[in-house]
Regions:
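A structural signal for well-ordered alpha-helices, especially hydrophobic packing surfaces
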Residues: 26-29, 127, 146-150
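N-terminal helix-turn-helix DNA-binding core of bacterial DNA-binding proteins
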Residues: 32-71
């Protein structure tokens, strides 16, 4: 059985390989998103914002601006474009009628989801090869690194 000392010996080398692997994966994800956006007929930023709304649920324009760092005018243009395509709708907030929420029209995004389906199947096949504990480790890593990324985005948007 490996001791903690011997199991840690190669850790810097693995981390050294992980960092560029993460960058390559991130770049590949961006390129995949751009290819999907071209197929759908939207720009890649609009597609990413659509996904953020889908992930976060109905959102106000202000919430979208805070999450993305876009100006209020840019967010209005984004919502207008997505609404023209029938992908989102503006609705009054049931709890505060003064608020307008942007909701993804899930009945209209099926064709976009279908474009992501082959990737989801391929990634699912890779994930199936990991143990439950390894999957928990991956989940922990992605949740924590996602938080770090969003914090850095907020810092950059605040001029830091």
């Amino acid at each position: 059985m490996a001791t903690k000392k011997t199991s840690q010996a190669g850790k810097p080398a693995v981390i050294g390989r992980l960092m560029p692997a993460m960058r390559r994966s991130s770049a590949a994800g961006v390129l995949h998103g751009q290819a999907i956006a071209r197929k759908v007929g939207v720009n890649s930023s609009d597609l990413e914002c659509l996904d953020l709304i889908l992930l976060n649920g109905p959102s106000t324009a202000g919430e979208i601006a805070r999450r993305t760092g876009l100006t209020s005018g840019a967010v209005t243009g984004l919502i207008d474009r997505l609404e023209r395509l029938g992908l989102v709708e503006r609705t009054a907030d049931a709890n505060d009628r003064r608020k307008v929420l942007v909701r993804v029209r899930e009945d209209k995004i099926g064709p976009i989801g279908a474009l992501f389906s082959p990737l989801e199947k391929s990634i699912g096949a890779i994930l199936a090869g990991y143990s439950r504990e390894e999957l928990r480790t991956l989940l922990d890593f992605f949740e924590r690194s996602g938080e770090v990324l969003l914090a850095r985005v907020a810092e950059l948007n605040d001029g830091k």
